[in-house]
Amino acid sequence: MRVLSIVHEHDAGPGVFADVAHERAEEVVEWIPARQAPPAAEGFEAALVFGGAMHVDQDDGHGWLPAEKQLLRSLLGLGTPALGVCLGAQLLAEVAGGGARRMTRPEIGWTLVELTGEAATDPLLGPLPARFEGFQWHSYEASPPDGALSLARSDACLQAFSLTGAPWWGIQFHAEVTSETIAGWIAGYRSDEDAVRANVNWDAVLLETNQKIARWNTRGIGICRRFLDHAASLLVAEAQA
């Protein structure tokens, strides 16, 4: 299996998903849209789309965004399974016919996430506890197209969705993140406008991270494994059809 890993920024990479991808795939192709021309959509059996500080409506400020969206449209047309995280989830929602919108208040830190009833049979999120704490850092929220399944929510926004008729999932929470990444984000972005608006207690976030990251990484690894295993099962089914 050949997996496309779309990384928007050096400090927003695949995290704990990286080892899973290399474990499950024969080849992992990392694409950094701001630096490289897009690869051909054909030839990938799965795609992972990660986060970034930019937003889905900033095509003018990030000239590579339209090309990425076109590549994602091609992947959707081919039926290629995709899992988007944070910005990645918002991009998948927009490309599929929905969008993303700015939130009244950014969501940063550890928050309670609750699965919906529709998540019970979902191959990715179904094995998770009905309620869990997940790590967040976002000021936009995904608005998936009509017909998409809402799989999880927090008090602030939709946290996970899947498309009907296509093997695409979006998760707003950062299931891929490591403790080192969180510390780096706090050091680099704590003075940003959105972080200031959120009025975050950074010492508390770091303390919670130390307490919760091991379990969180286990859950993130599980989500990525189940996604790639599902993608592999679709390949087997296609070969047997």
How does the language model describe each region?
Residues 50-119:
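Cysteine-nucleophile active-site neighborhood
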Residues 4, 29-31, 48, 83, ...:
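Hydrophobic/aromatic beta-strand patches that form the interior of the parallel beta-sheet core
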Residues 20-23, 63-67, 100-101, 153, ...:
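Glycine-rich, phosphate-binding/catalytic loops in enzymes
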Residues 96-180:
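Pocket-forming structural segment of enzyme catalytic cores
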Residues 17-18, 42-44, 147, 181-185:
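Short aromatic-enriched loop/helix-cap "lid" or pocket-rim segments at secondary-structure transitions
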Residues 1-80, 197-241:
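N-terminal beta1-alpha1 cap of cysteine-dependent amidohydrolase-like domains
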Residues 166, 175-209:
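C-terminal helical/coil "lid" or tail adjacent to the Rossmann-like core of SAM-dependent
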